[in-house]
Amino acid sequence: MLRITNQQQIDLLNGNVQRIQRDLFRVREALASGKKVNRPSDEPIAFEQIMKFRNVLNNIEKRSLAVSEAASRLNLSESAVGTAETIIQRAKEIALQQRNDTSSAAERQAIAKEVHQLLLSFVDAANTKINERYLFSGFETQTAAFALSSSVSASGRSPSISANDDNTGTTSATVSIQTAGSLTGNKYAITFSDSTTFDVKNLTTGATVLSSQTYTSGANIDFDGLRVVLTNNPSGPLGGDEFQITPHNASDATITASVSTASALQPNVYEIRFTSATAFDIVNLTDNQVLSTGNSYTSGANIVFAGITAVITDGTVTPQAGDLFRVRPNYSYQGDTGSIAVEYEDGKTIASNVVGSQVFSGPDVDLLNALQNLEQALLTNTPSDLSTVIGNFTTGLDQLTDARADIGSKVNRLDRLAEGLDLLAVTTQDERSTIEDTDYAEASSQLATLETNLQASLLTLSRQFDISLLNFLR
């Protein structure tokens, strides 16, 4: 029979006390920290699972933040496109109002000031930033999407022809320079007394140029250096129909222009006005300011002003007094076509930006150019140019509407992704909590049991120690 000595009993009881004390430490630590697994040694398998859950939660948090930032970018982008849409709608209303012949040059120049502000507001919308980063520049987020930098428009005041709004026939009309040396630069009207007879009148001088001419569809109508061709489309003109030819240069000199100092460019319309065959003035039409007067003209020489270099070259006829040449810097896209992708799941991404060249300057219409064309047409009192502008605005509004719809669909998708990530985070957190977090009711019960067991073990140990000591003293 195995005999257990007093010392062995004491050692067993002491080991039991130490085990209970270790368990008490773990339970008290779990109650204090709220975690029942605090180190790998507590539960190695559970600790490994907890670390995996933490990594998953970190990835979810990063993706949720990226999705949230993407939604913010797209929401602001949608707002900017909406602002642009409102601007273009107003610009179209102005173009429709000013296309008629009832507005005076002064009235058109006055309304051009509003158009200029619309242009600047449109540029601001296209150059919207979030967190100091441009929204519509692709990957080039530190570069403004649109700026005056490299493109300049330049043209002489060439003749153009337009049908009166109240014409009842359907006739196409073109005008070109036939003999530059015979040009007067004046305004003309071709008026039909019936479907086969017309007169040509110089509206500037009041003189009749051609009288009782017989109309033939597609035939040349030549006068004062101009050639007009009227063509049935599909029917011909009717009595009372009228076609007007705008004032134009009396020469066929041409102009080109380029940027000389980009930092000096302003979004203005400039006019080079010839006061004689050898001298010209330069006027800022936008601000109605004369930049210089009495400049000496030499064919092919550089004309430098406001960051622009213009060159006028003689044709068969040198520029004449009254000839006008218009110059303006144009806005152009400065970004790239980069798509900023956001990963919402392993290997799956969604674009979080829209490219300005596919919203404001394309894919169908360059709306900044259309706004500049509207302003120039009003400043130069050429309502015949407004029909093209109106058509561009109509197409451009569809372009902006399509862009808003595309952005809206992306925002909706991001909202759904955010909801999915939130749900995944909650589910993962619950699973982690089941393994890691303290069950306070269970732990409190364990604490009470262990404390009772400890007291009992200590009492037993004490008694056994007393017995051992008494036996020793005997």
Where are these regions (language model features)?
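Alpha-helix initiation/capping motif
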Residues: 5, 43, 148, 162-165, ...
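Intrinsically disordered, low-complexity regulatory segments in eukaryotic proteins
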Residues: 147, 153-160
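Extended, beta-strand-rich, solvent-exposed assembly scaffolds of outer structural proteins
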Residues: 157-329
